[in-house]
Amino acid sequence: MADLLSVPLKKPSEVDIVNPLKNLIQSRYSTADQPEDYSEQINEFSKLRNNAIWRAFEKYESSLEVIYSYYDQLVSLETKVPAQEVQIPFKWKDAFDKGSIFGGRISLTISSLAYEKMCILFNIAALQSSVAATQSVENDESLKLAAKLLQQAAGIFSHLKSTVMLSIQQDPTPDLNPDTLGALSALMLAQAQEIFVLKAIHDEMKDQIVAKLSSQCEDLYSECLKMFQRENLKQLWDRDWIATIAGKQAGYHAIAEYYQSLVCKSNKIIGEQITRLESAMELFKAAQTRSGKAAMFQDFANKAQRNLNEAKKDNDFIYHERIPDIKSVAAIGKAQLAKIVPLGYPLSQNFQDLFSELVPVVVHQAMAAYELRKNEIQNGEISKLRDSTQFLNRYALLVYNLNEYCSQTNLIFSPNYNAP
């Protein structure tokens, strides 16, 4: 492959989600006249979680659909049960922590579906990067899949960066730090642009296009390198990550110069062609030195060296053009095809909600508020009716007593009697 960097997965811990969910749903939704039993669905949900969190470590494309389904189920369930009442202690370990010699690891436990969702999203993006890294550069469909997954991963890390602190409301593990997530999003985007460069070369696109794509790739790796070298982050990464990024930044600058030299060659601008090839050779050597990989971009370096020898020979015998300084030549244009793909829902292709019959919590709360208000109105009206009934009863008793009194004193009484 193109020596892509893949993000390590967060390590989960097994938890009992069956009993807490069963108790919560029964207490919230089940009544004496309408008992609710979701035991089967809850057991399936538990199996789905176990399958998703452990299948991710197999790092196959088929594992993506499994973890997508679990994420979709989490999103759906979060709308149907009160988040503050979920008492499931989800524990996740930091993805970049190697542990000490005593076996200790950085971890965080939070009883929150939102936290579980954040960790699953991190692992989705990490798995996408791993699957992308296994794709072949010789196959067009593989290149398309790699570009798609890397852009989606960039979107997920970007989404996590902006939402994680609000979701968990406490200090996260280092892998979920917003600065870390921003750096990972930048890395995924740079690698996606790299895939577009490789596809353009594979498709034999015009030299000018490849040069512009490579120039943009160099810019993205340069920005990525700045983030990875921050003091609060650089201790997180594997030993060769920063070196690889620095090497690719120089390497894609070199490739941009190489392909721009081919444009100069086709336009018979031999002096500039030689300048760009000389610059490309220096950059290829810098890429190999920075990365610590002597073979990095070696095939391109060999092509550039052959072209440089031929160009110098032609210039010495035919053109005799002046060789300009690399700083004086026109800047190479840029073309960015890699984009951050926003997180969508659902992620899985055929998502089926296990709890489709559960009323969303907002609807349940609205219905509860409706029932409460209805009872208040009904009780108020009944109270008014009782008061009116008591008044009429007292009035009727008064009339009866007056009639009795009048009959005993030979007086005539009528409620409608008008005195003269």
Model-found features: residue ranges?
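Eukaryotic intrinsically disordered, low-complexity segments enriched for acidic and Ser/Thr/Pro residues
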Residues: 1-114, 175, 203, 207-209, ...
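Structural register within alpha-helical repeat arrays
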Residues: 117, 124, 131, 189, ...
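Amphipathic alpha-helical interface segments within eukaryotic helical scaffold
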Residues: 121-122, 128-152, 157-228
